[in-house]
Amino acid sequence: MSVRELVVLGTASQVPTRHRNHNGYLLRWDGEGILFDPGEGTQRQMLRAGVAAHDLNRICVTHFHGDHSLGLAGVIQRINLDRVPHEITAHYPRSGQRFFERLRYATAYRETVALTEVPVAADGPLAVTPAYTLDARRLSHPVESYGYRLTEPDGRRMLPERLAAHGITGPDVGRIQRDGSLGGVALDEVSEVRRGQRFAFVMDTRLCEGVHALAEDSDLLVIESTFLDEDETLATDHGHLTAGQAARVARDAGVRHLVLTHFSQRYSDPEEFGRQARAAGYAGELTVARDLTRVPVPKRR
């Protein structure tokens, strides 16, 4: 059975707390797993969440600050220790190549798994598969940072009443889907476009064009909200977003489910992030992330 969900492994920002691990997010997309921003302690969080190294197919790093990348060393070594039977692909800013190599080879271990490095150097597609296209967009942060967007190809939804009106039943339904027409009836006449699902991952950044482009029409948006609104100046100075800013991005982009995360340790009440997001006018589904939370990708409309 296909599963599309986000598994939150960690939600802290610069430093972990007693209740929050450094960043880490696994997107399950049918039979594939994409690990985003594995911070320190991600390998242990994977164990707690029931995520195996075998579940991973891609690793996407937004930038090389420690809370988004220090877990790479342990995760990569675990992939090799467990002899994952498939290739792993890693995406990260090309400008951080030296950091990736230091983390990949932080200590001695036996390499048993092919890990393909596909660094990001500009906006655009990184991978095109039958299941999705993975794109990157530049963000605005003191070090080079990219956000990621996964887009499923549009499909077709067959309309039973139109099929019946044209007398198309049984195996003929498959034939018209495959061939595009049947007996003078075009596929467009008996079906409609089923928009593919869209997922966006936006970490450390100020407001910028890339944030809006990544979020546009997303079914599920995972976005940093390091600061509360009263600290907006501090957020901008350090290259981050507030809860209200993140919520307005989601509101204006038509996001269906907003996940706020990457919280500063200075705040004791995480629910205030949710209250400020609602006050900013976001009316869709909202999750203030906690470690080990699972968030399903919203069902297709």
Swiss-Prot record:
UniProt binding sites for Zn(2+) 1: 63, 65, 141, 204
Superkingdom of origin organism: Bacteria
Record-annotated active site: 67
Swiss-Prot/TrEMBL keywords: Endonuclease, Hydrolase, Metal-binding, Nuclease, tRNA processing, Zinc
EC number: 3.1.26.11
GO molecular function: 3'-tRNA processing endoribonuclease activity; zinc ion binding
The record's free-text note on cofactor binding: Binds 2 Zn(2+) ions.
The protein's required cofactors: Zn(2+)
Reactions catalysed: Endonucleolytic cleavage of RNA, removing extra 3' nucleotides from tRNA precursor, generating 3' termini of tRNAs. A 3'-hydroxy group is left at the tRNA terminus and a 5'-phosphoryl group is left at the trailer molecule
Residues reported to bind Zn(2+) 2: 67-68, 204, 262
EC class of the enzyme, as a word: hydrolase
Complexes and interactors: Homodimer.
Similarity section: Belongs to the RNase Z family.
Protein task: Zinc phosphodiesterase, which displays some tRNA 3'-processing endonuclease activity. Probably involved in tRNA maturation, by removing a 3'-trailer from precursor tRNA.
Protein name as annotated: Ribonuclease Z
Species of the source: Streptomyces coelicolor (strain ATCC BAA-471 / A3(2) / M145)
Gene giving rise to this polypeptide: rnz
